[in-house]
Amino acid sequence: MDKFDANRRKLLALGGVALGAAILPTPAFATLSTPRPRILTLNNLHTGESIKAEFFDGRGYIQEELAKLNHFFRDYRANKIKSIDPGLFDQLYRLQGLLGTRKPVQLISGYRSIDTNNELRARSRGVAKKSYHTKGQAMDFHIEGIALSNIRKAALSMRAGGVGYYPRSNFVHIDTGPARHW
C-alpha cells in the first residue's frame, strides 16, 4: 500500500505540474503577467507633442502618468480631455512587446468629443457614429519602421478588442471594445 501511495503522489504531482504549465500565460500575455514597469513613448502627429510615460509601476497604475496620457490623447480640435481606458495603454504596451519594438508610437487620433466625431463623420464615411474614440477607448496610430500589416497581424493575435486596418491612410486602429476586425 505504501508503494501505491508513493506512486499516486508522484502521479498527482506530475499532473499538477502539467496543469500548471498548461495555464501559464502565453508569450503574448507575458509582458503583462510579470510585475514590471510599463512605459510608453508616443508622438502626437497633430500637436507635435511627445511623451514618455511610465503608466504602471509593476504593482499598479500611476495616476499622475495616466493624467498626462489623458491630456496627450485629448481631442486637440476641441481641447477636451477624457479619461482614457488604461486597458488601451496595456494593449498598446503588449502590442509593442509582440512586435519587438519600443520605438515611439505615432498617435493620429485618441479621444474625440462627440462634436468632433460628428464633424469628421460629415467628411468621411469611415468614421463610426458610436465610435470608441468618443468613449476614450480607441486610438489610431502607426510605428515608424514597422509595417502596418505587421502591426495589424500582431493586434489581431491578441484578440483584445477592435482592430481596424487603414493602409491608404497609414494607420491601424485599436480599441478596448469587443474583439472584431475590419
UniProtKB/Swiss-Prot annotation:
Function description = L,D-endopeptidase that cleaves meso-diaminopimelic acid (mDAP)-mDAP cross-links in peptidoglycan. It works in conjunction with other elongation-specific D,D-endopeptidases to make space for efficient incorporation of nascent peptidoglycan strands into the sacculus and thus enable cell wall expansion. In vitro, is able to cleave the mDAP cross-links of soluble muropeptides and of intact peptidoglycan sacculi. Shows a weak D,D-endopeptidase activity.
Q: Which CDD domains match?
A: Zn-DD-carboxypeptidase_like
Needed cofactors, names only, are: Zn(2+)
The UniProt similarity line reads: Belongs to the peptidase M15 family.
| Protein's name in the database | Peptidoglycan L,D-endopeptidase MepK
Q: Which superkingdom, per the lineage?
A: Bacteria
One GO BP annotation is: peptidoglycan turnover
Which species is listed as the source?
A: Escherichia coli (strain K12)
The effect of disrupting this gene, in the record's words, is:
The deletion mutant does not exhibit any discernible phenotype except a moderate increase in sensitivity to certain beta-lactam antibiotics such as ampicillin and cephalexin. A double mepS-mepK deletion mutant bulges and lyses in low-osmolarity conditions. A triple mepS-mepH-mepK deletion mutant grows very poorly with extensive lysis and cell death.
The known PTMs are summarized as: Exported by the Tat system. The position of the signal peptide cleavage has not been experimentally proven.
The note on cofactor binding and number reads: Binds 1 zinc ion per subunit.
Q: Which SUPFAM superfamilies match?
A: Hedgehog/DD-peptidase (SSF55166)
Spell out the molecular function terms from Gene Ontology. Answer: endopeptidase activity
Q: Does the keyword Secreted apply?
A: no
